[in-house]
Structures are given as C-alpha cells and as structure tokens.
Regions:
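N-terminal capping/linker segments that flank leucine-rich repeat
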Residues: 48-114
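Tandem repeat scaffolds
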Residues: 1-75
Length: 114
C-alpha cells in the first residue's frame, strides 16, 4: 500500500507496481520507465504525474484514472502534429476537453488542426 507516499523524483525503473494502491501518492517527476516496470491495472486516480516518465508499452495499460489525468493525457495527445486526417479529426474533436488541462496557462491552449 503506497497510498499517500511521496515518490516524487523517485527512480521506480523496473518496479512492479501492477495492482498497486497508489491513491494520492505523489509521483511527480518519478521515473516510471523500464521494460520490466509493470503498471498494469494500477490505480492512478488522484496522482500528480507532472514531469514523470511514463512507459508507452503494454505494461502501462488499463490504469484506473480520474478526469484530471484523462484530460492531461488528452492534452498531450492533442498537442502532437500528425498528417493523418483521422488523427487530426480525433484531436479536433477532443480539443475542448484537452484544453481543460490544469497547466494550460503555462503550456498554452491548443488550437484546431487544419
């Protein structure tokens, strides 16, 4: 049970956090990367994931997330440029929600893709 733990700046590379209770844990700045790091099914609701390294592998799928984190992920997705028309359409359809990002004032509002 890692609830309320301050793991900010921690190097969790390779840690198996699958099914971990991380409720209200501070993960800001933590390194969650590494091919052996298993975050599947982790409860990420209420987490501060600003400045973390999140692996884009199957080991970080199926998280339980809250609206704040979902919006943060959408903001990052919508910030990228992709020439594919279907991706641009998806990004544009999600912009209103993505621009609710808690750091939009600092990072800037995302404009529609053309």
């Amino acid at each position: 049970n890692l609830s309320w733990a301050n793991l900010g700046e921690a190097n969790l590379r390779g840690a198996n956090l699958s099914w971990a209770n991380l409720s209200w844990a501070n993960l800001g700045g933590a390194n969650l990367g590494g091919c052996s790091n298993d975050l599947q099914q982790a409860d990420m609701r209420g987490k501060d994931l600003d400045f973390t390294v999140i692996p884009l592998s199957c080991r970080s799928l199926k998280w339980k997330i809250d609206r704040r984190l979902a919006v943060q992920f959408l903001y990052h997705f919508c910030s990228h440029y992709c020439e594919d028309a279907d991706i641009k359409t998806a990004q544009n359809n999600l912009l209103a929600l993505a621009n609710e990002f808690h750091r939009v004032e600092e990072c800037g509002k995302i404009e529609p893709k053309v």
